[in-house]
């Protein structure tokens, strides 16, 4: 799963990537909901569902959220992506979340990984596309 997350981070941070490119990469049953595209049964091993959210332009992805079949241990994420920054839960009473700033050298954008930690690890991860500030 770590290798898949790294690959998707490079994809989402690529200059010129579109929502359609990312949906094609996920290769599942896609349903366009206007603001986002739900992808059921993506071809990514270990992923049950994905949601690709559009940025304000409607063309590029803002982020992609993956619902995982098996949790990824927090220790594996930290060993692979470095020390995370805790961020507030998505909603009151929601799972703890950890933000990993990823070192993606791929043009004008970079990526961050936000892991929702419950029990044995992260069952939901979000890869966010961020403009490179430095």
Where are the predicted features?
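Short, exposed beta-strand-loop hairpins at the edges of beta-sheets
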Residues: 103-106, 110-121
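Short helix/turn-capping signatures at newly exposed starts of structured segments
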Residues: 1-92, 96-98, 121, 127-134
């Amino acid at each position: 799963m770590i290798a898949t997350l790294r690959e998707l981070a490079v994809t989402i941070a690529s200059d010129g990537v579109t929502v359609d490119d990312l949906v094609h990469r996920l290769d599942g049953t896609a349903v366009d909901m206007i603001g986002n595209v739900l992808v059921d049964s993506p071809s990514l091993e270990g992923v049950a569902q994905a949601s690709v959210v559009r940025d304000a332009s409607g063309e590029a992805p803002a982020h992609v959220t993956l619902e995982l079949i098996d949790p990824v241990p927090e220790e594996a994420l930290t060993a692979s992506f470095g020390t995370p920054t805790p961020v507030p839960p998505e909603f009151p009473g929601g799972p703890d979340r950890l933000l990993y700033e990823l070192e993606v050298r791929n043009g004008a954008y970079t990526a961050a990984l936000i892991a929702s930690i419950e029990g044995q690890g992260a069952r939901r991860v979000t890869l966010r596309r961020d403009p490179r500030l430095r």
